[in-house]
Swiss-Prot record:
Name by which UniProt lists this protein: Cathepsin K
Effect of residue 283 to C: In PKND; does not affect protein level; does not detect cysteine-type endopeptidase activity
Catalytic activity field: Broad proteolytic activity. With small-molecule substrates and inhibitors, the major determinant of specificity is P2, which is preferably Leu, Met > Phe, and not Arg
Cleaved signal peptide residues: 1-15
Source organism: Homo sapiens (Human)
Gene name of the record: CTSK
Disulfide linkage: 136-177, 170-210, 269-318
Keyword rRNA-binding belongs to the record: no
Amino acid sequence: MWGLKVLLLPVVSFALYPEEILDTHWELWKKTHRKQYNNKVDEISRRLIWEKNLKYISIHNLEASLGVHTYELAMNHLGDMTSEEVVQKMTGLKVPLSHSRSNDTLYIPEWEGRAPDSVDYRKKGYVTPVKNQGQCGSCWAFSSVGALEGQLKKKTGKLLNLSPQNLVDCVSENDGCGGGYMTNAFQYVQKNRGIDSEDAYPYVGQEESCMYNPTGKAAKCRGYREIPEGNEKALKRAVARVGPVSVAIDASLTSFQFYSKGVYYDESCNSDNLNHAVLAVGYGIQKGNKHWIIKNSWGENWGNKGYILMARNKNNACGIANLASFPKM
């Protein structure tokens, strides 16, 4: 029994006290990401989470160098948060309990001809810069706005930043920073006969009173279409033929939180646990691994300048084709 206690001591001490050898790195990370804490106890608590995440990243990248993984991780501005906190504060997908696809909104792909092997709407000028939703559950608004921006570019030739704040404040069927769903946003824009530009209705990262002003209207919508559930082939056709598509994924894993580069595939990703809305802006293949090009709304410091390549045709990894939709313009 005495020997067991001795063996457990290093583990317990690591859990209770920061590693002194990491002091300089911790201070550098805090300075880089402008982190401040309420008190010493709060900082130590966050430091221990950061150290745990740093260890996870290091072990993963060692495994990646040995060919175990197809992607790498890196420390970022979310380093002092647990994956549970990230889901709670920085996602926000909320699917209506009564949600069901109708034939009126179902996307029926045109299967004639072959879809391109790769598509990247960033290169075509359909995609605005990466945004940061902050600690507001407004991912659904950024995903919806991204799909609307793509269709606006396709129809008018103009690329404009549309207003996620307009959706956060005004879509009564959703819950603002408490979460929402993309098709509710498209329906709002249709019924409202428009959505303001970002310049006219800037993002503030919290829910406020609806201040939509028709003079700031930059786009409108005449409905939406939903991809057949779980059908990645149909999603590929939609991305190729229509443009950027709003999609929902499981973003609850630590591996997603610290993604850096490569094609993301984690067997633990749960296609039935959809909690985050993002935007599919293309697809392709890297080193033999098929992928979706996904735009996130966690800022450019996350992922590969705000983007992630997610595994494609791997049994609907992370549920990416389960709740996909796009607006009609």
